[in-house]
Amino acid sequence: MFQQLTYRLRLFRRRHKYIFINSIFLSVIIIFLIYSYWSNLPAEDNSAIINEKGTYHRSLWESITMALFPPKTKPFEEKKPQVNPNNNQEVGVESGASEISQHKQQQQQQQHAKEPTTKTSSKSLVSDEAYQLNLKLINEQQEKYNRLHPFEQKRLQQGYEFFDNIFKIFYQAKPSVSQLNTYPSKKRIYHARFDSLADDDTIFSEKYLSQFLQLSNEELAAMKKSHKYVVENLPEDAPDGLYKKNGIVYVAGGSFNWLTLLSIKSLRAVGCHLPIEVFIPKIEEYESDLCNRILPELDARCIYMKNQLMNPNKDNSDSFANKFEFKGYQYKALAILLSSFENVLLLDSDNIPAHSPEELFENDPFKSYGLVVWPDYWKRATSPYYYNIADIDVSEKYLGSKYNEVEGQYTDLSVEKGSVELDKIPLHQRLGSIPDPTSESGQLLISKKTHLKPLLLALYYNLYGPSHYYPLFSQGSDGEGDKETFLAATVTLGKRYYQVAKFLVSLGHFKVPGGDFEGCGMGQFDPQQDLEYIKLREQYAKIPEKDKEKQHKFKLQHQVLEKGPEILFVHANFPKLNPWKLKQEKKIFDAKGNRVRLYGPGMIKRIGYDFEWFQWEGMKYLLCIYDVNLQIFQDVKKSDLCDEILEHLRFLESTQNITD
């Protein structure tokens, strides 16, 4: 019996010898990788992904897969600089030569800009070849996506029919009057910052706002007729199956491709796993390395506008969408509408999430309201004519809410006409009007299940925006565009919305100590924490002022009451985070040539990690390690670009301990 058992054991070992050896070998590798991963983690870490300095830590599985299947691109080798102790600037033997070559390069670029018509015929041939190549790549990518998602083709076909009907309504609702541009004088509306504390004699009352854009009776009647038609004919709901799940949408194209990629890189690094769709408006703005190689690895994909709007395999000459020319501000509403997601967070390409926005979809205020908008700096200047056109009753008896940007709150008012003079009340404090302040559309959270019709109406406003609706919303003041259309459409249709009460914060720095503040971006706050903060503040106000102990305990239990909502989005809109352009235009240098932090040293306290350093680390990863090939950097030598990124990274690292 024992001999038989021994024989079987030897037989098993001979037959499975190589499997046994391979198993031991793989086990040793995995144990080594686990040990390496844990030994490289810092002792104290605020997050599994980003630590307090903004350093990205790969997950265990990511470390294993990268070790077993390393990226094909060759890592960029960082050069160790020589440092001048007097000014912390890098110096080298060829520093003078590099300045001369840089000057020559700038002269060549300027000369090239002065001669835009040279080699026109060859450029047109290249453009035609690029068009055909991009079209082929787009179709191949879509076919691949369709194979992985069996119901996608049916969904697209549903969309083609639905959108054609929608654009038929838009076309038939075209205003019969020409552009609205009649003003009594060259004077335009005072573009005032919303400031509750300012001693401003200009009240944006109905009387004041009626002094600018003028409509004749014929124009007013025609606008009312077309608006009524579109409101009565637009559907409330989309076809079943056209939209599903939650996702994030960007509008890219051209120079915005790079900014979108940088934002997506940050989004993934802060732990957001939501799928992403990148809207490409024009075929010449499609970049194969971005759409075919990089984005799929980040669980994102490009969607080409025309192929989502009309069937590319059919003759679309009679399509109603073809009767419109799309550009600029119309892209945002189109991007939301053409995306496959039911619930959408729309982000500008230069808008970078500081933390994961994933929880916003599953909690209030979004779950209850279906639309979340964020405030902008300015007072609302919407013409009283708009409310007449949209058939909105702006009360002369009751007020709606009054906004206080210092406290970050709306106060409900219920004052009857007899106790106030309407000429002394802002129009947009009256019940029924669109509330102050204006909206900032760098981020927008919307449900197409509850707000499809407002979205369609907003698209209508944007299609006829430059000629008709932008003058009604902004009356010729600065900053007119799509930002007013989403909330205006929602108010017009009587849908719910939530406007974040916490006022945006300006982010920037002082180039000269004691000098003027130079704004470089805007910080927008977490709406979930904003709503929680409002509710807790109401509860706190009910605690008797004498009961200090109860007040203290309440604050300890609710940290958000003490700290306030946190910054969720950094809209890095001026200057854009293009590392080479920042250097060329000296945006990251002070008057003496020393490097500066764009958003100042206080960002580490505000965000919880070194946000600015982390963006430049993302640039290094994308451009120097992963070797992303984008048109925006095609005229820049990669080694020069990466040297600049590394030099600025070293500066940012050297200033991480400065927090004031």
Curated annotation (Swiss-Prot):
Superkingdom, natural source: Eukaryota
The keyword Methyltransferase is annotated on this UniProt entry: no
Segments of this protein annotated with the region Disordered: 75-125
Name of the molecule in the record: Alpha-1,2-mannosyltransferase MNN21
Main location as per UniProt: Golgi
Cellular location(s): Golgi apparatus membrane
GO molecular function, one term: alpha-1,2-mannosyltransferase activity
Pfam families from the UniProt entry: Mannosyl_trans3
